[in-house]
C-alpha cells in the first residue's frame, strides 16, 4: 500500500484516512476494475474491494481488500501454487468510504475520480508498506507460514511511490547496459539476485527514513 506517513483520523470524515500520493487515475482503476486471483488451482476474476480483512503489522492496524492490477503475472507464473491473491493495504475505515463513493457513482470512472480529487488531500510525505504472506506444508506435511514485511521511503527528493515505481525501471536499464537482459523482457523473468545486486535497487529501495 502507498500511504501517507501519518493521518489525523476523524470518523465523521472517513475520507481523511487517505491522502493522494500517486496517480488518481491509477487509484480509481485499482478500485473499479476486476481483480485476477487463483482459487483452488483455478484462475478467475473477483470484484474489487471484496475480501476485506484486518492486518496488524508491527503494532499498526491496517485493512486490506482485493484491488486490480497489482498481481501482475503471478497467477500465470506460479503454476504449482493453488491459491494466489493480491490486496492493497489501507488505514482502517478507508474501504468503507470508497465503497460508498463507488455506490454513489455506480462505478463511473470520471465521477469517482472527481470525488477523490475533491476529498483526498495530496501529500509527498508517504510510505510504501509491503506485506507478503505464504502458507503451505513442509516435507513432513506440517503447516508452515513464511512472511515478509517492510516499509519503503523516498530518496533524493523523490517520494516513496516515485522511488519504488521508478527504481525497478532503472534497475532493468542497468541490467540491459550490463548485457544481463536483452530486448523486451517481463520483470518477473529476471533473476532476483541480479535485480537486487543493481545500484538502482540499493539506492531507491530505502527502508529507513
Task: Go through each PLM region and give its residues.
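C-terminal catalytic/substrate-binding lobe primarily of soluble NAD(P)-dependent oxidoreductases
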Residues: 1-209
